[in-house]
């Protein structure tokens, strides 16, 4: 059921799914009391709790809800829906496709390999691994020491069997039971249960030795030695019987870096670096909570998760994780000196990771907000351009950028009513027509995209064009929409009330974004203008030529590929068009020639 208000929603646990007017899912949330939570969204914009909620409600069209029996069920459903839809306004763990997983297939004789896609195929997945080199090295170690097959089709013994790196299940040199016993050992290692693996290997080794199967016993002895050498080159931690994840966070306005120090069987076994996107407006507690929910929906679960500070809904999250792991799990805050030190190490690494990410990928919206001293992040930018030939077929374009990217479904085209070749007056007309649709009090809770108050309006031009837009806004009583003019000659940015322009650095991502917006508005206007011109050309010229019907007109367009090419074609070139004889070609050529003279 598509709902506009929460009046009919019950006070029960559940999940709500918000959509925009294009039916895209833009936010997924859960609540113990659905109605109360949803009511918090339907207030005046200045009373909404954070800027991101304001942006969300500007694009809101309707919502749906799903009731659950418990808050835990709501939590699980929310996590699954976020993973499915990846909504724009939810905090999101950087796309999991960028991180590799180790996959153990669901075959009679399973294989182990790297994948970046998790599918519902009953296979076992372990990860994500932020270091693909480490993951591949680990797979090589497992395949070699447990003699796991690597071939996709079991066609007979291969080189790996000859060099004792495969047990050759393809020709039954190993039973399915024995092979899958090795797979179970591999799974224990991937879960970080090294002591359990070694204990089981020793038990099997002693059994083989007792039965005088010395070759098999020696193989297990070598596996035990290799595991000890390979996986236990770590500093010993105080609690050697508990598997722990120690997690440190650092963040700026847009993203958070997360570092996980994984301690397995008392050894620091690996360090993972991950990124959370879309955190602007969320508290530190909310960021920690969203990370725990998203990361541990797929990652192996330790016995204890140690954080710098607490999370929301801890009891419900612990209950959910324990059900997934089938063992007790604790989420604790570091109080012991040793763990406080490890948290500091994780935070320091997160800070380094965040700094490197920021250097590599400057956020143009943040930079633009800073340089232009805007009141808010310019998430929604609108820009205009005029296209005409001496006032004929005059059109204007409006392009929209959201989050630094073209939002083409929101583009608009305008046919100009202003007479004569007056770009200045045409720009005034289109600005007036566009912004007469929005209300001065900034009520954006509607599905009409033209009612949205932009975060920045970009005018193509300098002081004069900008001043014209300022006058229009004054007449319309619009005071909360920032304006800027981009003068093309020196790429200077003009702001209302400022005499001197702002010169953005040539390599600035903010300048590149403004240029992209300006150029896109120009492209869109030119395309519309050419379409009108072409339509008028085909109607007034080709349709008036005797002998040129629909099929021959199409033949001309197919042959010459554009109307301009037809217009400039020679007599001989027109003769080459299929279905057009010399007599008709002469008529077409002379008609177009006369039209050019006019």
UniProtKB/Swiss-Prot annotation:
CDD domains: GIY-YIG_UvrC_Cho
Annotated keywords: Cytoplasm, DNA damage, DNA excision, DNA repair, Excision nuclease, SOS response
SMART domains: GIYc, HhH1
Domain of life: Archaea
UniProt-annotated location(s): Cytoplasm
Gene3D superfamilies named among the record's database cross-references: 5' to 3' exonuclease, C-terminal subdomain, GIY-YIG endonuclease, UVR domain, UvrC, RNAse H endonuclease domain
Any GO BP: nucleotide-excision repair
UVR domain residues: 195-230
InterPro entries linked to this entry: GIY-YIG_endonuc, GIY-YIG_endonuc_sf, GIY-YIG_UvrC_Cho, Hlx-hairpin-Hlx_DNA-bd_motif, RuvA_2-like, UVR_dom, UVR_dom_sf, UvrABC_protein_C
Any single Gene Ontology cellular-component annotation: excinuclease repair complex
Pfam families for the chain: GIY-YIG, HHH_5, UVR, UvrC_RNaseH, UvrC_RNaseH_dom
Domain GIY-YIG: 11-91
Molecular function GO terms recorded: DNA binding; excinuclease ABC activity
Family according to the record: Belongs to the UvrC family.
Function: The UvrABC repair system catalyzes the recognition and processing of DNA lesions. UvrC both incises the 5' and 3' sides of the lesion. The N-terminal half is responsible for the 3' incision and the C-terminal half is responsible for the 5' incision.
HAMAP family for the chain: UvrC (MF_00203)
Subunit structure: Interacts with UvrB in an incision complex.
Name listed for the protein in its UniProt record: UvrABC system protein C
Biological source species: Methanosphaera stadtmanae (strain ATCC 43021 / DSM 3091 / JCM 11832 / MCB-3)
Gene name of this polypeptide: uvrC
